[in-house]
Amino acid sequence: MTLTYDDTSRSVKTEDWNIHYNEAGSQEAPAVVLLHGSGPGATGWSNFKTNLEPLSAHFRVIAPDMPGWGESDPVAKEERDHAKAAVQLLDALGIEKAAFVGNSMGGITTLRLATEYPERVSHVITMGPGSGPQPKLLTPGGGLSEGMKVLVAAYRDPSAESMKRLTEVMTFDNARFATDELAAERAAGAAKHPEHLSNYLDGFARGGAIAQWFSLDALESMDIPTLLIHGRDDRVVHFENSLTLLARIRNSRLVLLNQCGHWAQVEHADEFNRLVTGFVTHN
């Protein structure tokens, strides 16, 4: 059986937000929550549709649209507390603790959850999160990365042409993954919710799109099993950021994937699914 968006689509009212999510797997299995990255047209499904079904053979898998994305509530930057939203989602679904898997922005949220709500987090898995504005040794240039420049441009012009450039900078194997079909899908998703785009750009103009960062110092007292996954060829967030996290989080390990861009869960889906399944099962 191949799971579809409609098969897995759900929604719930939490204390502060209406949250849409996709869910698969037994409700009796350990919970794994997949947190998507930013970008126009991004959703839980768009980021993790190649992972939901394989992981659901072992876990109760939940992939929410975070507030400000997809079918969840639009929010201004000041109201965009994704860690709080994730905890409220657990509460609404009756889940005491979950493994959190976060891509990019979702990885930043996952690290906030681990440091601010550690009692709700069993495992931490990140793919390509930033580590904050501290000086870097290996990252080329300064300021916004090449990928972030393309991403912000796509928010300003969410056309299929812009989305094509975005998918190209997100992936290493453009011929396989940066397809016209994916660009059209992301453009259609972005056009469906123009309020999400304007809220993102407004927040970006006022100090950056990430409303709240984790504390690097707080990572040093983390003792939650942590798996850091990063693409060696990531042009959005350089893998040096995960080296910084590895140095700070004592109970962590790093897997650096060769010939892989910012979407490790897409470009190396089979390996990613094996890594997540093994790590959550055996740690």
Residue ranges and their predicted role:
Residues N22, E53, A63-V101, R274:
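Active-site loop/oxyanion-hole signature of alpha/beta-hydrolase fold enzymes
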Residues T115, S122-P158:
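Flexible "cap/lid" loop of the alpha/beta hydrolase fold
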Residues M222, L228-H230:
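Short beta-strand/loop motif that positions the catalytic acidic residue
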Residues W17-E71:
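Conserved HGGG/HGGXW glycine-rich cap/lid loop of the alpha/beta-hydrolase fold
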Residues R156-E220:
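Conserved alpha/beta-hydrolase catalytic His-Asp/Glu region
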Residues S252-N283:
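Catalytic active-site module of serine/aspartate enzymes centered on a nucleophile-bearing elbow/loop
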Residues G102, G106, T110:
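Gly/Ala-rich beta-loop-alpha elbow adjacent to hydrolase catalytic centers
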Residues D233-V237:
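Acidic catalytic loop of the alpha/beta-hydrolase fold
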